[in-house]
């Protein structure tokens, strides 16, 4: 035992060169065998070598907390704190300690909330990622089983197959060579062939083959682990961070402009005293900075990410949520996503090509060329046709099994029968099997005719071949291949696929089918699912030998308008995504295999479907834990809701910055009104506490793909902010310069105190600003009238509590240090009424802004539309053009002559493409309908009629 421990210690200290010694010495050095380790021995080694994962840097909690105070928005607040304690120390007054303490308190509160929420989000993310932890097939206690890769130890026997990411450094055992992609480690672009005895590194990907291996190094002792210590992590600035920075910079610049104007006017022109001027500058600094913005947006995404995981979509990076919200094209695999991937074979339809052979023999040969364990869907379907799965190996001894790979597209079994003769059977893609057949020229036409016959019924074809191997060795080429027969495979569509596709089209997401099957199969599936039949063979569009008949047509247009692609190879997926992105589409791509990884990485949202390989999961942004398309569409809706919350807040934040800067700047410059900085702090603290609840607000997702439109955010914020600033200016003028409020409501006048120190007027302005500022969130969060869309209960409760506190402060507070005095309940009621009256136009302003930004207002001017245009005629030309275009492009490879209407914005392009797809889908559905009711509904949808205005009666 002691000798064994010493040997393992030597392995741990890397004094033994396990990479280069003969494989038998590896077993001797690791004190293990080809039968694997026992669980007890593995546990002992785990304690010695540690877990098979890289050590994570432990970050100081305190430094992490302080980190939330180190960003541009916090710097502005910290500058305000320095101003309050240093620059404010003048004019015969002591330093502004209360403002200094208030600012520091606000910073600490915000950082604390950020720290707690991010910590919770981090724990939740860690729990989610644990579900995606890489697995390894390992031999323990004489049995193969799937275990977490983290518990592997040197001496374990593992199995590496196509699509696996190698879980640890290992030496390969006997068998056929593997193709290993080491590009992530060495930069080599082409896969490397690795045979028995060769070493494979942790982190590389198996591109072809299947082989067992013995683990020689784990965790930090692997080649990848050592390299990771030498490389510093790079901070990639994502799009979300860029948006956050842009909005923060806009707010900072707005404050800077306001402060410069105040300094220029107050001191050289108005000759104001030093200290009041500093106080006015502090008001702009403290009130204008959206200090809670990073926290609110990060928390919103973290909570949203958790909700997505509950729906079966785990986000590997939270910023994928914004891309998901903006996705307008989804390229979806047919098999397993649109269909069940539960194949069935109709034995009566099997076509036999060799004399003296019946359908049962073809089935048996196909079963022999299948796996009995770790089966894929095809193997399971074929072996399941036998009365007993053991028949597939009855009376034969397996010599060698060739697993499926994307290049050969077939499996093969070499075996010895009871007479000692060697044979080989193979099943796979008909074209590949046909290439093997010795009589290809004689049977090719019939084979293609049968394939086409199957395809017209939506059936895939599987070919079976047989040969004798007289040489008696597994490496020998063998005798001539006999083409035995063709088997039809049916993969039924999911029960919810058709409805989900219709939902997707209604959401502005154009679903394109991606299938490796024949064009006829793709079209038949598209017809059954109601997604249209405007499909093309990808090789004709993107292959090296393009179809001459479409060579002159614009390929990008055909790809953009297509409902799907057939005969797709992995490299075609990448090209399809690339061309769609070049047309400014936000493209999602589903995938499951190792060869899908490049396309998944290229796509804006790479989606690894349920049961995807490790390589596909590694390359994706979102990993599905449930099969089917409905999970993706539900994730789109949830992502849009999350994005809507973030956009609502950013518009609110910009609006508040403008209203504070413009409003208080005008009060200070026109009437020389000095609002106390401490009260702006109170507004900020109450606002931040309330606005945190927006991360769980009830929102209505956008009906179309959404994205960050900074011009819309800034324009809306400036208009809202300017309107609210003028509300405050008008209120101040009415309360200070007129007797309107005392005369109308019988409240006391504020004019007398105004000549002294503005204390009561300051309380009134504080309450007016506090109420309308927080109420604005109800306007920005809704797409229609704010009082129609019910907000989340948390937001309502937070608003009521915050404004109750604000009202009590304004009514009762007599704070000399803050220069305010209670105004009583009468004035509080007047201010609430004033804000309610001026709140109502905010919704109208919102609609006008949206209308102006959409460009439709300018379209009406340009096209000289008049008010007397009838509703049924409005847009008639566009509908007719769309109808004609859909009819022209439904069949064949015809490119559109021109765009249907002048597209002035990317938004219009997205909705147009989705609208066309909806029409093609409705045409496909029309063919399936045999009732008068269904026919009428389809025609109504196709022609864009308003069903509500048509009085019709029909019977089914």
Swiss-Prot record:
GO terms for molecular function: ATP binding; ATP hydrolysis activity; metal ion binding; mRNA binding; P-type proton-exporting transporter activity. Residues 1-65, 119-247, 296-647, 698-713, 781-792, 843-956 are cytoplasmic. It is a multi-pass membrane protein. The keyword NADP does not apply. It is found in: Membrane. The modification Phosphoserine is found at residue 938. Its EC number is 7.1.2.1. The modification Phosphothreonine is found at residues 889, 955. Its main location: membrane. Residues 954-956 are annotated as: Interaction with 14-3-3 proteins. Residues 86-97, 269-277, 670-674, 735-759, 814-821 are extracellular. The plasma membrane H(+) ATPase of plants and fungi generates a proton gradient that drives the active transport of nutrients by H(+)-symport. The resulting external acidification and/or internal alkinization may mediate growth responses. This is ATPase 11, plasma membrane-type. It comes from Arabidopsis thaliana (Mouse-ear cress).
């Amino acid at each position: 035992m002691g000798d064994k421990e010493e040997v393992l210690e030597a392995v741990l200290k890397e004094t033994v060169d396990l990479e280069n010694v003969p494989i038998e010495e590896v077993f001797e050095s690791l004190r293990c065998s080809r039968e694997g380790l026992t669980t007890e021995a593995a546990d002992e080694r785990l304690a010695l070598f540690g877990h098979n994962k890289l050590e994570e840097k432990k970050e100081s909690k305190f430094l992490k907390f302080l980190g939330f105070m180190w960003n541009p928005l916090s710097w502005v607040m910290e500058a305000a704190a320095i101003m309050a304690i240093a620059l404010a120390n003048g004019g015969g007054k002591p330093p502004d300690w209360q403002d200094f303490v208030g600012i520091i308190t606000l910073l600490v509160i915000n950082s604390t909330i950020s720290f707690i929420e991010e910590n919770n989000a981090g724990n939740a993310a860690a729990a989610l990622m644990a579900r995606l932890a890489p697995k390894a097939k390992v031999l323990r206690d004489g049995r193969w089983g799937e275990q977490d890769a983290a518990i592997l130890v040197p001496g374990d026997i593992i199995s590496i197959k196509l699509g696996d990411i190698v879980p640890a450094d290992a030496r390969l055992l006997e068998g056929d060579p593997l193709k290993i992609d080491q590009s992530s480690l060495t930069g080599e672009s082409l896969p490397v062939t690795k045979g028995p005895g060769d070493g494979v590194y942790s982190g590389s990907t198996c591109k072809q083959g299947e082989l067992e291996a013995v683990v020689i190094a784990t965790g930090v002792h692997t080649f990848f682990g050592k390299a990771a210590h030498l490389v510093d992590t790079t901070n990639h600035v994502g799009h979300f961070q860029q948006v956050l920075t842009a909005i923060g910079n806009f707010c900072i610049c707005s404050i800077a402009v306001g402060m410069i104007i105040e300094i220029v006017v107050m001191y050289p022109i108005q000759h104001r005293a030093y200290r009041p001027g500093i106080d006015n500058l502090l008001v702009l600094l403290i009130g204008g900075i959206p200090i809670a913005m990073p926290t609110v947006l990060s928390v919103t995404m973290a909570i949203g990410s958790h909700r997505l995981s509950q729906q079966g979509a785990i986000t590997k990076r939270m910023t994928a949520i914004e891309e998901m919200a903006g996705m307008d094209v989804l390229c979806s695999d047919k098999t397993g996503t649109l269909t069940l991937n539960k194949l069935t074979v109709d034995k009566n339809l099997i076509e036999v090509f060799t004399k003296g052979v019946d359908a049962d023999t073809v089935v048996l040969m196909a079963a022999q060329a299948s796996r009995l364990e770790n089966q894929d869907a095809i193997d399971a379907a074929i072996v399941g046709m036998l009365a007993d799965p053991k028949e597939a190996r009855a009376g034969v001894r397996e010599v060698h099994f060739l697993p499926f790979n994307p290049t050969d597209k077939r499996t093969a079994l070499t075996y010895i029968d009871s007479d000692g003769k060697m044979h080989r059977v193979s099943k796979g893609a008909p074209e590949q099997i046909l290439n093997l057949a010795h009589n290809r020229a004689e049977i090719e036409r019939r084979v293609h005719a049968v394939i086409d016959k199957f395809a017209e019924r939506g059936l895939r074809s599987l070919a079976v071949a047989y040969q004798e191997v007289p040489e008696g060795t597994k490496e020998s080429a063998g005798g001539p291949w006999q083409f035995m027969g063709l088997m039809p495979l049916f993969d039924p569509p999911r029960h919810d696929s058709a409805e989900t596709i219709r939902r997707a089209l209604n959401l502005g997401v154009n679903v394109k089918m991606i299938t490796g099957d024949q064009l006829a199969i793709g079209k038949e599936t598209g017809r059954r699912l109601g997604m249209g039949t405007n499909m093309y063979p990808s090789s004709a569009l993107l292959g090296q030998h393009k179809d001459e008949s479409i060579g002159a047509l614009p390929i990008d247009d055909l790809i953009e308008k297509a409902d799907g692609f057939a005969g797709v190879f992995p490299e075609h997926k990448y090209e399809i995504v690339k061309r769609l992105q070049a047309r400014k589409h936000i493209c999602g791509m589903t995938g499951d295999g190792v060869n899908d990884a490049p396309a998944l990485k290229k796509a804006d949202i790479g989606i690894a479907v349920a049961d995807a390989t490790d390589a596909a999961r590694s390359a994706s942004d979102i990993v599905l834990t449930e099969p089917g398309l409905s999970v993706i569409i539900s994730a789109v809706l949830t992502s849009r809701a999350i994005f809507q919350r973030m956009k609502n807040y950013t518009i609110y934040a910009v609006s508040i910055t403008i209203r504070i800067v413009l409003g208080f700047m005008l009060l200070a410059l026109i009437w020389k009104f000095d609002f106390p900085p401490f009260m702006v702090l109170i507004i900020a603290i109450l606002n931040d506490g309330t606005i945190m609840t927006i991360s769980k607000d009830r929102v209505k997702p956008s009906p179309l793909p959404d994205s960050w439109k900074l011009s819309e955010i800034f324009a809306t914020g400036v208009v809202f902010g300017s309107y609210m600033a003028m509300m405050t200016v008008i209120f101040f003028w009415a309360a200070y310069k007129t007797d309107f409020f005392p005369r109308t409501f019988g409240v006391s006048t504020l004019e007398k105190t105004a000549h002294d120190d503005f204390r009561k007027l300051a309380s009134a302005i504080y309450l007016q600003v506090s109420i309308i500022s927080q109420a604005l969130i109800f306007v920005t969060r809704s797409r229609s009238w704010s009082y129609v869309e019910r907000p989340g209960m948390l937001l309502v409760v937070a608003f009521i509590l915050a404004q109750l506190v604000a009202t009590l402060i304004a009514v009762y507070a007599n704070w000399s240090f803050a220069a305010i005095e209670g105004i009583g309940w009468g004035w509080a009621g007047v201010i609430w009424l004033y804000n309610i009256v001026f709140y109502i136009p905010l919704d109208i302003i919102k609609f006008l802004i949206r209308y102006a930004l959409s460009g439709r207002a300018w379209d009406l001017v340009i096209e000289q539309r008049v008010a007397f245009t009838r509703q049924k005629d409005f847009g008639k030309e566009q509908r007719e053009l769309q109808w004609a275009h859909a009819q022209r492009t439904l069949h064949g490879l015809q490119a559109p002559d021109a765009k249907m209407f002048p597209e002035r914005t990317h938004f219009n392009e997205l909705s147009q493409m989705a609208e066309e797809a909806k029409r093609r889908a409705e045409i496909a559905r029309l063919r399936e309908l045999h009732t008068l009711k269904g026919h009428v509904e389809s025609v109504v949808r196709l022609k864009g009629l308003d069903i509500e205005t048509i009085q019709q009666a029909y019977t089914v």
